[in-house]
Structure formats: C-alpha cells, structure tokens
Design a protein with these regions (language model features):
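Rossmann-like dinucleotide/flavin-binding elements
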Residues: 3-37, 43, 78-88, 92, ...
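N-terminal Rossmann-like dinucleotide/flavin-binding domain of flavoprotein oxidoreductases
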Residues: 43-93, 206-232
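Short, hydrophobic/aromatic-rich segments at coil-to-beta transitions
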Residues: 238-242
Length: 309
C-alpha cells in the first residue's frame, strides 16, 4: 500500500510510455504534484506499437486504464509537447524523471541506406507500406512481433478475441467428434507474406523470449512459413535484396524490404544538460537501460522509484 508523502514535490516526467505512465500514476497517488510531458498526441509510447501485434491487442485496455488513472490522481498531462532542458529549468521542478524511451539501433551493413530498408518503427508506428517478400534482421522479441504483424492480412485483422479463427488455424475440432479433439486435416492457407527472420547468433531464434511462450511464438511463425536463419553474416543490401553468408555459403535473399529489428539505444539527450545544471534527474525504462523492450520491467522500475521519492 502506498504511503502518502510528508513533503509534496513538484515533479516533471518526460515521456508517457509504460515507464512514464507508471511513475506518474504512483507518484501522484502518493500526493506529489506531477506534470507528464509527451511529444506525441496520445499516451502509450511503445505500447502503441505493441498493441498492433496479433495477440497483444489487450494493451489498448492497459492504455485506457492509465488514461483514467492520470485523470483520477490529478496528473497534469501535456500531450504534443516536446520539452527541452530550458523548459524544465524554467519549470523549477524538484525532480525530473526521464522516461524518454529508446531509438532503434541501426547496424553497420553495406547499403543500410537503401530504399528497401525500413526500421521496425516505420512499420509499426508510421504504417509504412511493406512488400510481399521481407527479410527481418534481428530475431529478438521485436523481430518476432514484426514478423507476426507482417503475416496478417490488413483486410482480415483479428481483434485477438475470435476463437473460431484460432481453432481453424490449429485444427481444433469444436464438435468433439474426433479422438483428441483434432480435425483429420488442417486446411493450410498461403502465408500473406514470405518472411526470412535472421540473426547473427548461431543459437536458436527467440531464445530470449518468455520461457512459457517462446516455443509457441516459434511454432506459430514456422506454421506460417517463416524461414528462420541463425548464424547469419550480413554482407550487403542492394537492389536484389539482402546478401548474406549462411552455413558458409553466400546467397541473396530476394526481398522487397529489409526490416531492421536489431535492438535499441537509450534516448537520453536531456540527461547530461539537466545533471550539469544541478537538477535532480532520474532515468527509467528504456532511457535507463535499452534492452529488449520490456514493459513489465519498465513499469516495475518506475513504480519502485515513485515509492522512494
């Protein structure tokens, strides 16, 4: 149970993603005066990309919840507002929380500036058009999510709540007329896109995914015909596609687009200037540590910080 604070502080939070929302909620609930700045016109940050991935539609409800909590606990929400160091200094805040998230990491590959190349943010956030043949560089959580997203036909987007669609895909016999509750033959559909999911490491793809769900994600992608390539050396991106060395052989993956999902770097450009100005400043979420996008970890870290301030 959160204890009310003895001394109310004036706190600025920059970034309304999972970490910024969690901190603002917990700090305001304890009695602090919180102003939350967000450069976009809506709250959510990375959640706004995650909720577009099949099976993660429930994040929309998470955002609705946080939106209500901001109102309930009096968080002053400033959307569409990009703040600079001077803005925060003029605000005379007791403490500043930077929950500014991450930037996609761009690998050093010959031809990385080719028009075929898209970042995962171009696909999930900006709605870039993607061709039918795709290579995904990076097979962590983001690479898997982007692959799942690209496999869905936009004209048949599921809400994630349609059991009939799930049963059909996996051959579940809802009539219970057959032994084991499975149909004799699953009607396989042609995948919406042809996808190569690639990683540099020679280990199994998706090894860092959840222990209880990683196998399911791998199975789902394999069922949809995704080609999973480990131990890949990237040589070049050109008009023909992505040139790689795999199993000692050089080959060209003839694709329309190459999607970069090779990690992130912290977005913390405000930190040095604020620290130099003597402001008590904290980094949370991806701005603190840019590992695989981890909303649960970011929310926990931000909440624990709010309980200490």
């Amino acid at each position: 149970m959160e204890e009310k604070v003895e001394k109310v502080k004036k706190i600025a939070v920059v970034g309304a993603g999972p970490a910024g929302l969690a901190f603002s909620f917990a700090a305001a609930k304890r009695g602090h005066q919180v102003t939350l700045y967000e450069s976009e016109k809506s709250i959510g940050g990375q959640f706004n990309m995650a909720k577009k991935v099949p099976g993660k539609e429930e994040f929309e409800e998470t955002l609705r919840y946080y939106g209500e909590m901001m109102k309930k606990w009096g968080v002053q929400l400033k959307l569409g507002t990009r703040v600079e160091t001077n803005d925060l200094l003029l605000g005379e805040y007791d403490e500043v929380i930077l929950a500014t998230g991450v930037n996609p990491r761009v690998p050093k590959i010959k031809g990385i500036g080719h028009p075929k190349v898209l970042l995962y943010t171009d696909v999930l956030k900006k709605g870039a058009e993607v061709g039918k043949r795709v290579a995904v560089i990076g097979a962590g959580g983001i690479g898997f999510d982007v692959s799942e997203f690209l496999l869905q036909d936009p004209s048949k987007v599921s809400t994630g709540l349609d059991k009939t669609e799930y049963f059909k895909k996996w051959g579940v016999d809802t009539s219970q007329a057959r032994p084991g509750g499975l149909v004799e033959k699953i009607e396989e559909e042609e995948p919406f896109r042809s996808i190569y999911l690639c990683q540099r490491k020679a280990s199994k793809l998706g090894i860092g995914l959840g222990k209880t769900t990683g196998w399911a994600h791998r199975l789902s992608l394999k069922k949809d015909g995704v080609h999973m390539l480990a131990g890949v050396e990237y040589k070049e991106i050109n008009d023909q596609g992505l040139v790689i060395i795999h199993n000692g052989e050089e080959k060209t993956l003839e694709v329309d687009h190459v999607i970069i999902c090779s990690g992130q770097t912290p977005k913390r450009n405000l930190f040095p200037e604020l620290e130099e100005a003597g402001v008590k400043v904290h980094l949370v979420g991806g701005a603190h540590e840019a590992k695989e996008l981890d909303a649960k970890g970011a929310i926990k870290e931000a909440t624990l910080l709010a309980l200490k301030i």
